[in-house]
From Swiss-Prot:
GO terms for cellular component: cytoplasm. NCBIfam families: lipB, PRK14341.1. Pathway: Protein modification; protein lipoylation via endogenous pathway; protein N(6)-(lipoyl)lysine from octanoyl-[acyl-carrier-protein]: step 1/2. It comes from Ehrlichia canis (strain Jake). Its EC number is 2.3.1.181. One of its GO terms (biological process) is protein modification process. Coiled coil: none annotated. The keyword Plastid does not apply. The keyword Cytoplasm applies. This is Octanoyltransferase.
Amino acid sequence: MSCDLVEWKIESSPIDYQEAVYFMQRKVDSISDGLQKELVWLLEHPALYTAGTGATVEDLLASNLLPVYSTNRGGKYTYHGPGQRIAYVMLNLKTRNKCNVRLYVKTLGDWIINTLSHFSIKSYFNPDLIGVWVTHNGIEKKIAAFGIRIRKWITYHGVSVNIYTDLSHYLGIVPCGIKEYGVTSFKQLGVNVSYEEFDIVLEKKFNEIFSSFN
């Protein structure tokens, strides 16, 4: 399936988390029924925490700091908020003949790694610690988190990339259940980029990486 058939939707203001989940669930049904195109949805949320299907109470360190939403994506606790670019990806793995979840996650990783490389950020995918990582001043830190769900072989939820995120909000959780490593952002790495600049490269790299994902 050509990447030209994938719709791109970019939001200019923060989207309520529950509203976003409801939209994705309806979109999954429409894609499965052949009524709508696949979609990559770029947005940001107000400051909040989400608890994936693997979340444990011990990983929520400050329950009163921000709103907390339980969600059906994979993974544990993560933070979403201003300065973080979220890409919710709704693709039909069945029509792409790619009913392979591991391959899909790896392809997501390749997409983000190639995008970051454009901005001279060297990053890598760690299959044991899901997400995209960088080494900064000799310390490994996560710059992009993954959390996906697949229903009817349609993917949804997706990837969050820290651009100029307030990293102090991560102190209220154990991000993705990983105590040993921290998080970082474009800003902390000394890379200044706008959403507009990032989105252009993100779409370009998506078309390159996912062109063979069918």
